[in-house]
Design a protein with these regions (language model features):
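Conserved P-loop small GTPase signature centered on TRAFAC-class small GTPases
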Residues: 15-19, 73-170
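Switch I (effector-binding) loop of TRAFAC-class P-loop GTPase G-domains
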Residues: 1-19
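Conserved beta-strand segments of the P-loop GTPase G domain that flank and frequently precede/overlap
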Residues: 24, 48-52, 81-84, 113
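Short acidic active-site motifs
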Residues: 32, 36, 58, 98, ...
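Short, solvent-exposed loop/turn segments at secondary-structure junctions
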Residues: 31, 57, 88-90
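Switch II (G3) loop of P-loop NTPases
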Residues: 19-34
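Generic detector of well-ordered alpha-helical packing
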Residues: 8, 27, 53, 85-88
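Inter-motif core of Ras-like GTPase G domains
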Residues: 34-56, 62, 66-72
C-alpha cells in the first residue's frame, strides 16, 4: 500500500539514559508536498531518502531528492538511502548493486528495510539517533564524517540481521 498524503509520527527512543524524540515525516515523495518537505529539510538533523525497490520510478526520483537536500538542508546533514520492501525481493526492479552505486555517488550509506515486516526499521532509527546524539554530546558537533570519513552511520553492529546497512566503501 502506498502513502496517500503526509504521514507524521513521533518515535521516542532512550539511549544511554537520554530520551530522544524523533519526528518522522513521510511525504511519499509526492510533488504536491514539496513545499512542506523543503521547509523541513532546513531543520532536519537526518534525512532518510526512501525508495521502493519494487518501483523503478521511485528509485529514479532519488537524484531529485538529493538535489533538494543539497539545496535546502543544512550542510553536513546525515543522509541515508533506504530501499524499502525488501520482503518483496522477488518483485525487485532496482538491484542492490544499483542502489549501492548511487549511494556511493553521494557518499552516503545504503540499507534495505521492510516496513511491513519491520526488517531493520528499529536498527535504522536507533543507529541514526545514536549517531546524532554522539555528534551533539561527544562528537565535534558538525555532523560531518565518521570513522570511515563519510556522512553516515555504521549499522553493522547487529550481525544476526541479514538486511544490514551496506558499508559502500571502496
Amino acid at each position: 500500500m502506498n502513502s496517500i498524503g503526509v504521514d507524521f509520527k513521533l518515535k521516542n527512543i532512550e539511549i544511554d539514559s537520554k530520551k530522544i524524540k524523533l519526528q518522522i515525516w513521510d511525504t511519499a515523495g509526492q510533488e504536491r508536498f514539496k513545499t512542506i518537505t523543503t521547509s523541513y529539510y532546513k531543520g532536519a538533523h537526518a534525512i532518510l531518502v526512501v525508495f521502493d525497490i519494487t518501483d523503478r520510478d521511485s528509485f529514479d526520483h532519488v537524484r531529485n531528492w538529493m538535489a533538494d537536500i543539497d539545496k535546502f538542508a543544512k550542510e553536513g546533514v546525515l543522509r541515508i538511502l533506504v530501499g524499502n520492501k525488501c520482503d518483496l525481493a522477488h518483485s525487485r526492479q532496482v538491484s542492490m548493486e544499483e542502489a549501492k552505486e548511487i549511494a556511493n555517488k553521494y557518499g552516503i550509506k545504503y540499507i534495505e528495510t521492510s516496513a511491513k515486516d519491520t526488517i531493520t526499521i528499529d536498527d535504522l532509527f536507533i543507529s541514526t539517533a545514536k549517531y546524532l546524539l554522539s555528534k551533539q554530546i561527544g562528537g565535534t558537533g558538525t555532523g560531518k564524517g565518521t570513522e570511515n570519513g563519510k556522512n553516515g552511520i555504521d549499522l553493522m553492529n547487529n550481525n544476526n540481521n541479514q538486511h544490514q546497512m551496506n558499508n559502500n566503501q571502496s
